[in-house]
């Protein structure tokens, strides 16, 4: 699978996440499963010629759960973005 196909999948997942949020659902993209593809793929009944690119949980987040209170530091958008106007 080429880089272009992986980018297509990423864009599709982003659109699914936006559509889910518009319907009141939450999502959590997970790439950690990729390291366990040899375990996960047989459990899914996936053919040998398929790849695990990522996973996504879909549902209702418990906003009060401790795991959902983590706010990691983030770089300010203006520190890595150049806005071109006019």
State what each model feature region is.
Residues 45-48:
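Short, hinge-like loop/turn segments at secondary-structure boundaries
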Residues 1-43:
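Small-aliphatic-rich amphipathic alpha-helix that forms the alpha element of a beta-alpha
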Residues 52-86:
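C-terminal helix-cap and adjacent tail motif
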